[in-house]
Regions:
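C-terminal beta-signal and adjacent terminal beta-strands/loops
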Residues: 181-182, 204-266
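Flexible loop and strand-edge segments within Gram-negative outer membrane beta-barrel domains
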Residues: 24-29, 33-37
């Protein structure tokens, strides 16, 4: 279900809103664990409302938004606090929701030059993220991450995308993307500092049959980890310091890379 409305105050300025409501059922991969997943309907409501402004040199929208997703299925391996070799799987079904604010603008101050700007603030949180198990010796173990920030999702996103058409067939461009602090595990005990990811390049349409391009990835040569830390999902803040200096597996920022490409059209 989708609905949208726009109200024009003037030829250039107005208000806009839209709402989308999607539903689905769990997919086949949710049945892979031994535990039966929650087969309740998954709902994804998305609502946005804000303003827009357009003229010859700028196109701008600024929107407040709300989005949620219910009945996400997951399985956690909980460890017996009295025996770290005693591990039991626990199924859970949880929700995610966030409110946010996004401003998107395309500026064309002079012929051939475009500048795209995007700013997003969001605060995605877990809801009903609770589960637990009882081990054979009677010991219980559980997790409650309700209210925690969703892993790997930054609160602040910024995109800066300038481009310039030297001729109608030759274009240079760059892209700067900022991701604020992201949490690396469910209990928000570990986090990665904010980072920039940078790209740049040149595109040349030689003729109707041949296009050439060159791209530089991470031209500021940023380094570091990102994403999540495998095996650290259930470490809490009180015990996080115990892992200082320990080797952990995760993912990393893509290193400095230069790429060339050619496209031939017959």
């Amino acid at each position: 279900f989708t609905a949208a409305a726009t109200y024009k105050m003037t030829k250039q300025f107005g208000f806009t809103a839209d709402f989308t409501y999607n539903t689905q059922r769990p997919n086949m991969s949710n049945f892979a664990p031994a535990e039966m997943p929650n087969v309740d309907k998954i709902t994804i409501p998305l609502g946005r409302a804000g303003i827009y402004f357009n003229n010859d040199w700028i196109s701008l929208t600024s929107l407040f938004s709300y989005i949620a997703k219910t009945n996400n299925n997951s399985t956690l391996n909980l460890i017996n606090p009295n025996n770290d070799k005693d591990i039991k799987a626990a199924a859970l079904s949880y929700d995610i929701e966030t409110i946010g604010w996004t401003t998107d603008a395309v500026v064309k101050p002079f012929k051939g030059f475009d500048f795209h700007f995007l700013f997003t603030y969001q605060s995605p949180k877990y809801k009903k993220y609770e589960t637990g198990v009882t081990f054979s010796d009677g010991t219980t173990s559980g997790i409650n991450a309700t209210g925690n920030i969703v892993t790997e999702i930054p609160k602040v996103l910024i995109e800066l995308d300038p481009s310039y058409n030297i001729t109608k067939d030759l274009k240079v461009w760059a892209s700067f993307r900022y991701f604020s602090k992201t949490y690396a595990n469910i209990k928000n005990a570990y986090y990665f500092n904010g980072r920039w990811e940078t790209f740049g390049g040149i595109n040349w349409n030689v003729n109707k049959h041949l296009s050439l391009s060159g791209t530089v990835i991470n031209f500021l040569n940023q380094t570091g980890a990102k994403g999540s830390i495998s095996g650290a999902e259930l470490v809490d803040k009180e015990n996080a310091a115990a892992y200082n200096g320990a080797w952990m597996a995760g993912s990393y920022i893509r290193p400095f890379t230069v790429e060339f490409a050619a496209k031939i059209t017959f």
